[in-house]
């Protein structure tokens, strides 16, 4: 099993190109099931989760071709995928594939919308909280789907097709919004999604669906209106830049010191995180190529943050911020409101010498003057990269184990950091 070895203490200087957003690429790939024409997606990141979803879609009969780089593409330019779901041969998504990634459960929506039936295994993925699919099931039932659970599978049928409805989520749910949005595009009549998630990735998917002929308004607001259409056609769409990757590298620079240009980043996608970084002592400069992050001389200031749905501080940057705050001059407080059990990285950060205490959903981080390298183990995707951030500033050597979590969500992480002066290498086997 691969590991990452890091010798801490180097400041970061240079340019890091930001990849396409995983959290947009996955639902965009799934949305290709809605049409029998080809969907072309540009700037798709090369990630383990993307490769897994290609296998899952292939199981349904989807043909996916990865195109080569075009003239002028950057070295890290995301891949272009040509996705054709002309012939869906199977409406079952098996346990052995779906159990590896929760987002793959979302195939239930386009399969129902287009084929009027689906049998999908209950999902897997990062072990963060329970993440029940109840809200997704509720949304589908509102659209006229008959559902049952049999031997770990959700068996769903809509013999007469989906019918437009008003769906009001009791709490904001990104997964539920994605599922309702995709399903409603081919439903008969009008669908209103109330208390919808406002994340940029939702808007990106809606933009792509509209290019395919959907009639969606209000994406990016709590109220989305979908006028169902009979058919969607092919389209070409570029995946938006990854705001979580952007925030992660910004926090790495704030941790080590130095100055890095985050090329292709879009500041409006993570303004809350940039505001927190400014409070922590980083200098943020917006320019034509993205975002420049620097911390020169000044120490790290403590912050108090509560995670919240967009446009609030993203839960997917909580672990990275906690790593940064281990070196702050004073006590920081981070409250996690999105997922339960999302403090699994605390005990691993403690191995560096971090001082962190937990009280319910709030973590108090008492900054220390130095961290020391240690062998650590990744527990989930975002926690794993928080260990990398800590290691970059720690004295001595750190070995990060179980890095398959990193490969799920960060494209060429060690290459990007190494190019900016970090001493970091992947050790195979």
Curated annotation (Swiss-Prot):
Asked if Metal-binding is a keyword of the record, the answer is no
**Modified residue annotations for 2-(S-cysteinyl)pyruvic acid O-phosphothioketal:** 126
Q: Which Pfam families match?
A: EPSP_synthase
Enzyme Commission numbers on file: 2.5.1.7
State where phosphoenolpyruvate binds.
Answer: 22-23
* Family of the protein in this entry: Belongs to the EPSP synthase family. MurA subfamily.
> Where do the catalytic residues lie?
126
- Gene Ontology CC terms: cytoplasm
Q: Where in the cell is it found?
A: Cytoplasm
Please name the source species: Rhodopseudomonas palustris (strain HaA2)
Q: Name one GO biological process term.
A: UDP-N-acetylgalactosamine biosynthetic process
Annotated TM spans: none
Q: Protein name, please?
A: UDP-N-acetylglucosamine 1-carboxyvinyltransferase
């Amino acid at each position: 099993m691969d590991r990452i070895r890091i010798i801490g203490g180097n400041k970061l200087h240079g340019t890091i190109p930001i990849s396409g957003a995983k959290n947009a690429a996955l639902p965009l790939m799934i949305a290709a099931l809605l049409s029998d024409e080809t969907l072309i997606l540009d700037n798709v990141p090369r990630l383990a989760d993307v490769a897994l979803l290609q296998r899952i879609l292939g199981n349904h009969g989807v043909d996916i071709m990865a195109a080569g780089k075009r003239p002028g593409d950057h070295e890290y330019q995301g891949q272009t995928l040509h996705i054709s779901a002309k012939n869906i041969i199977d409406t079952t998504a098996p346990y052995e594939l779906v159990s590896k990634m929760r987002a793959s459960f979302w195939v239930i929506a386009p399969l129902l919308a287009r084929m009027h039936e689906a049998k999908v295994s209950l999902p897997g993925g990062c072990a963060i909280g329970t993440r029940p699919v109840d809200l997704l099931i509720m949304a589908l039932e509102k659209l006229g789907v008959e559902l049952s659970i049999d031997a770990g599978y959700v068996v769903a049928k809509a013999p007469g097709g989906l019918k437009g409805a008003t769906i009001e989520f009791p709490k904001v749910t990104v997964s539920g919004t994605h599922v309702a949005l995709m399903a409603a595009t081919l439903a008969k009549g009008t669908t209103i999604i109330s208390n919808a998630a406002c994340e940029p990735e939702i808007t990106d998917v809606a933009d792509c669906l509209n290019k395919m002929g959907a009639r969606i308004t209000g994406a990016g607001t709590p109220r989305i209106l979908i006028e169902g259409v009979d058919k969607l056609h092919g389209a070409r769409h570029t995946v938006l830049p990854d705001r979580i990757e952007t925030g992660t590298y910004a926090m790495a620079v704030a941790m080590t010191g130095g100055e890095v240009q985050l090329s292709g980043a879009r500041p409006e996608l993570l303004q809350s995180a940039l505001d927190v970084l400014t409070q922590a002592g980083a200098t943020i400069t917006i320019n034509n190529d993205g975002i420049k992050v620097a911390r020169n001389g000044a120490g790290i200031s403590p912050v108090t943050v509560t995670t919240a749905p967009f446009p609030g501080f993203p839960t997917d940057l909580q672990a990275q911020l906690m790593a940064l705050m281990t070196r702050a001059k004073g006590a920081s407080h981070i409250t996690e409101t999105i997922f339960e059990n999302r403090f699994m990285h605390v005990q691993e950060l403690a191995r560096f010498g971090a001082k962190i205490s937990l009280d319910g959903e709030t973590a108090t981080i008492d900054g220390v003057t130095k961290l020391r390298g240690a062998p650590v183990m990744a527990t989930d995707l975002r926690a794993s990269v928080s260990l990398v951030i800590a290691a970059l500033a720690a004295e001595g050597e750190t070995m990060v184990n179980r890095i398959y979590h990193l490969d799920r969500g960060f494209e060429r992480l060690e290459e990007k950091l190494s190019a900016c002066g970090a001493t970091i290498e992947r050790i195979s086997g």
